[in-house]
Every structure is written in structure tokens, then in C-alpha cells.
Amino acid sequence: MILTVTMNPSIDISYPLDELKIDTVNRVVDVTKTAGGKGLNVTRVLSEFGDSVLATGLVGGKLGEFLVEHIDNQVKKDFFSIQGETRNCIAILHGDNQTEVLEKGPEVLEQEGQDFLEHFKKLLESVEVVAISGSLPAGLPVDYCASLVELANQAGKPVVLDCSGAALQAVLESPHKPTVIKPNNEELSQLLGREVSEDLDELKEVLQEPLFAGIEWIIVSLGANGTFTKHGDTFYKVDIPRIQAVNPVGSGDSTVAGISSGLLHKESDAELLIKANVLGMLNAQEKMTGHVNMANYQALYDQLIVKEV
């Protein structure tokens, strides 16, 4: 079983409009509300793929109850309740444009943060792999993800970590390393304080920097150009076919689902990387974020080749 962790989930509300009119009333007919957050995208894809998954994180108030109720019934859920209210994230789709209004979310009390660590520690007993995704809510220290990684390491569970900014920096600077990180070029540039290109020789040098020491897998997303990966002392490039992308949002989360699944099933390097890339592409072909059509899985899988470089 895979444990997905979403520390700052949301109710994602979609308002489709032909035109967004400013300073007047806009009436929406077709409103969509879903359980949102990067970790919950991972959860949905794992469930659709057929893997057993347990979802956890922080929820609060009536919106928190709504969120838990709107997670697929096939998914096991064990969220931790806090005093603050779970946030809304609103996307206004007007024409070819998308305007987002994102609430800050709840401020987590120090004791709630400590209590969740105990909750997380107990959940580790029943899972084989952990996937931690997304931002931290206000109130939690910047090194909170490092604390989660430390507990997972102590329990002997591999961790796929998909966060960015100060939270990722804190993990990289701590002695407690995740099994996998999945930065993109922009995030690598932010971490190193210099521009990082997609040149393979440069990426090889970058991923051998002391900052990344101790991390078994570093899978760099190159968007439409596939992925570049360092696993131990071996480097891989995966090229992907051109596809008709409908909605690329959530493709990174779908890739995390594939990585986590590969670790769960102890797949070879090539199998894990192909699965991760295929699930990312399948998400991009769908309108709904964090959703894959498994009927198209094998056709894409057969087109991908992993090259050692």
C-alpha cells in the first residue's frame, strides 16, 4: 500500500464562463467541486491505476469534511483534523484563459503539527511506500517535511518527495534524505541560484552537486522533452512522443504516482521510469486534473524507450 500525504489540501472549485465580466454579476451554470491538492491528485491516479492507497493530511471544519467525503470510496482515508478551516481554490475558466483565486488556508497550531507526526508514525506501520506532495500550511516550520522523511526513514519506508522552495531546501540540507525527488529545471535553478539548462552534460554535473548527496533517485521533469534521471551512479534519459495535451496541470503529480507505484512493485529502473512518464502523459490528455484513462496506457507504454546516458 502507498501512503499519500497532502498537508495543505483544498476544495478545488471550477467556474467555466464564456466571458469574465468585471465589476458586474457573472452567473455560473456548471460548477465543479473536487478534493484538491497535489497529494490527492497522486491518490486519484494510483487508485485509477489499481494500486492500494491510503490518503492522509490535515483537514478542518465543514470544508474538510466535504473534502474527505469527495475522495473516491475505493481510497482508504485517515486524515487528521485541525481547528482551522480547509481552504478553497477557485479557477475561473473564461475563453482560453484561466484566472485563479487561491485561499491561504488554515494556520496550523504547533501542537497540531506535533500530533500529526504521531498520527503519521502510526500510519507508516501499514504501508510500503510514502509519497509527500505539495506545500506546507502556515504555522508549520519550514523543516516539517524533513521531520516526515526522518520518521519514514526510521520505519524503513521509501519516500517520494514532491515539494519545492524553502521546504525542499530544508530537506536537502538535513541529514534525513528522501528516496526520490522530482524537481524541474526551474526548481533546480532556484535551489542552486543559477540558470540550469536541459543540456544532458550540464544536468549530470548538477545532479552530482553536494546538495543532492544521499538521494537515491533524482528525476528531473523536462516537460514535453521527457525526463532526465540519476539513480545512484547511473543516468537515464526518457524521450516521450508528442501528444495532444488537453490539460497538463497535474501531470507532475501523475508522474509521482508512477514513481511510487514502481517502488511499491520493486520494478526495474526502466519499468519505473516508463510507468512514471506514461501516467504523466495520460493525465495531460484528460480535462480533469489528476485523472488517467488506463485504456490508453499500453499504447503509450510501448512507445517509450529508456536510454542510459
Swiss-Prot record:
It catalyses: D-tagatofuranose 6-phosphate + ATP = D-tagatofuranose 1,6-bisphosphate + ADP + H(+). The keyword Nucleotide-binding applies. PROSITE patterns: PFKB_KINASES_1 (PS00583), PFKB_KINASES_2 (PS00584). Keywords: ATP-binding, Kinase, Lactose metabolism, Nucleotide-binding, Transferase. One of its GO terms (biological process) is lactose catabolic process via tagatose-6-phosphate. Pfam families: PfkB. GO terms for molecular function: ATP binding; phosphofructokinase activity; tagatose-6-phosphate kinase activity. Pathway: Carbohydrate metabolism; D-tagatose 6-phosphate degradation; D-glyceraldehyde 3-phosphate and glycerone phosphate from D-tagatose 6-phosphate: step 1/2. Signal peptide: none annotated. It comes from the Bacteria. This is Tagatose-6-phosphate kinase. It is an enzyme of class 2 (transferase). InterPro entries: Carboh/pur_kinase_PfkB_CS, LacC, PfkB_dom, Ribokinase-like, Tagatose/fructose_Pkinase. It comes from Streptococcus pneumoniae (strain P1031). GO terms for cellular component: cytosol.
